[in-house]
Design a protein with these regions (language model features):
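A short His-aromatic
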Residues: 91-93
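Surface-exposed loop/turn positions
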Residues: 17, 80, 112-113
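Class I (Rossmann-like) S-adenosyl-L-methionine-dependent methyltransferase catalytic domain
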Residues: 1-19, 25-73, 116-195
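A short beta-strand submotif of the Rossmann-like class I SAM-dependent methyltransferase core
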Residues: 86-89
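A short acidic, Gly/Pro-enriched loop at the edge of an enzyme's catalytic core
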Residues: 72-84
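Conserved catalytic-core motifs of eukaryotic protein kinase domains, centered on the activation segment
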Residues: 95-97, 128
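A short glycine-rich, Lys/Arg-flanked "PGG" loop and its adjoining helix->strand segment in the class I
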Residues: 99-111
């Protein structure tokens, strides 16, 4: 992950910098973080994902901690981490859920710390495919995917500065690719923010 490698290059010395992976799933970003010299922590609401993450950490002898926790209520003290990452978790839920998750990431991030968050763009093919629950929020009705029935919130470019307004610096770019025989556009925001 480009963000982790770039961040590690900016940090002085071999100190174990604490990194939190919110929505860690099977722990793939924790593995890379550990290889780069971070002290990784991961949280997820999926016990299956956490079980896979624990097994991966044991197989690679990586010293890492994982815990069951919601992205909207993290079990850590303020300013606990040098870096926070969340790849594709914050958009599951309403606008309020996304705002709470971003606020929690900010809360646990140390002053000068950096975060990397991947959010869905309103240009994504999933946008508008399902029951509308609010502005840019839908219960997806796409059959044949593991996202059927999930609630997702999408952002336009002009929304990002407001959602990340508590951060001192915010940069974002769009990443797009196609799947399903090049018929389905995936469109995500790659957001880096500094406290």
């Amino acid at each position: 992950m480009r963000f982790l490698m770039g961040l590690r290059a900016q940090l002085p010395g071999p100190a174990p910098y604490r990194l939190l992976d919110i929505g860690t799933g099977g722990g793939r970003h924790m593995l890379l973080a550990g290889e780069l010299g971070f002290a990784p922590f991961g949280v997820d609401i999926s016990f299956t994902g956490l079980s896979h993450a624990r097994k991966r950490m044991q197989q690679t002898n990586l010293m890492a901690s994982v815990a069951a926790a919601s992205m909207t209520s993290l079990p850590f003290a303020d300013s606990s981490f040098h870096a926070v990452v969340s790849y594709g978790s914050f958009y599951y839920g309403s606008a309020q859920v996304m705002r709470q998750a971003i606020a929690e990431a900010y809360r646990v991030l140390a002053q000068g710390g950096k975060s990397f968050v991947v959010l869905r763009s309103t240009d994504d093919d999933r946008f508008g495919k399902g029951r509308e629950l609010g502005l840019n929020t839908f219960e997806l009705g796409i059959c044949g995917t593991n996202e059927l029935g999930t609630v997702q919130h999408f952002l336009a470019a002009e929304d990002i500065p407001e959602y990340f307004s508590q951060f001192s610096a915010v940069n974002f770019e769009k990443a797009e690719w196609t799947t399903g025989g090049r018929t389905r556009l995936n469109s995500d925001w790659l957001i880096t923010a500094e406290k």
